[in-house]
Amino acid sequence: MMWWAIWCVMVVVSSAASAAPAPDSAPMDLVQIDSAGPDDESLGYAVSSLEGRYGAEAPWLYLLAEMPRDSQIGRAAVKRRMPSLSIDLPMSVLRQKLSLEKERKVHALRAAANRNFLNDIGKRGLQWSRSEQPSAYY
């Protein structure tokens, strides 16, 4: 497995070394690289070469060739805020209400057990003799 990692590192290093310019090369002319795109009138050559491939079924091809270059740049798609159809929030509310109901039942059972325990204090003989034991505790 180690040879695979070494091979990957070698490929990355060699690609980085081959992408770097030679030390004795002339500096790049950034003005030439950043030059503006072709004029709108010169886009006719692209339309004529693509007509054979797409034919008359592609009216968008002519529309793109006739649009000015500035109108195609800088438009971000507007994100519409649609109402959410997620059930996460209602489910979390239901979970919370269920846990509160469970806690309420546990507290009620503990209170009843404590009440029964406190009713039995000082009445040790009641639980052993059936004749003296009342039918229900309140």
UniProtKB/Swiss-Prot annotation:
GO terms for MF: diuretic hormone activity
Record keywords, A-Z: Amidation, Cleavage on pair of basic residues, Hormone, Secreted, Signal
Annotated compartments: Secreted
UniProt entry tagged with the keyword Signal: yes
Isoleucine amide: modified positions: I121
Residues that make up the propeptide removed upon maturation: 20-78, 125-138
GO cellular component: extracellular region
GO biological process: body fluid secretion
Signal sequence range: 1-19
InterPro entries: Corticotropin-releasing_fac_CS, CRF
Primary location group: secreted
Family membership noted in the UniProt record: Belongs to the sauvagine/corticotropin-releasing factor/urotensin I family.
Function according to Swiss-Prot or TrEMBL: Regulation of fluid secretion.
Protein name: Diuretic hormone 1
Species in which this protein is naturally found: Manduca sexta
